């Protein structure tokens, strides 16, 4: 007996959320949940509007942005932590989804913080 498509889609999302930092493929998820790759991708996209692996990549990029803004962890280590196959792949995907390479993203964020703090200190002096 096949479960309702929306129930399956939510099971897939829970699985992806729990394993998004690991190397993961659509085939692995489909085998784990005992459905075809095509059906899994179809019901997931129908429910959430994006293909499952794009969902995973967006989760990873969101977490990477957090690491880049809030830590000084090297980019290669962030890529590894988030399950990227290589630093080159991570850089390419980060740029694809944000429009900026990770190093430049971090640098721009730090400059905006410095500029913001400088502006606040100038306001206090007035």
Residue ranges and their predicted role:
Residues 88, 98-100:
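Short glycine/proline-enriched turn or capping motifs at secondary-structure junctions
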Residues 10-14, 18, 23-27, 46-91, ...:
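Terminal helix-turn-helix DNA-binding modules in bacterial transcription factors
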Residues 1-15, 32-41:
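An amphipathic alpha-helical interaction segment
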């Amino acid at each position: 007996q096949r479960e309702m498509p929306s129930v399956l889609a939510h099971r897939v999302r829970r699985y992806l959320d729990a394993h998004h930092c690991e190397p993961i493929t659509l085939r692995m998820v489909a085998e784990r949940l005992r459905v075809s790759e095509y059906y899994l991708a179809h019901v997931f996209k129908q429910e959430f509007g994006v293909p499952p692996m794009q969902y995973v990549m967006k989760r990873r990029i969101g977490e990477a942005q957090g690491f880049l803004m809030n830590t000084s962890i090297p980019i290669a280590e962030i890529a590894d932590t988030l399950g990227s196959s290589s630093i080159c792949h991570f850089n390419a995907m980060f740029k694809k989804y944000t429009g900026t390479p990770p190093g430049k993203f971090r640098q721009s964020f730090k400059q905006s913080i410095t500029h913001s703090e400088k502006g606040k200190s100038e306001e206090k002096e007035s």
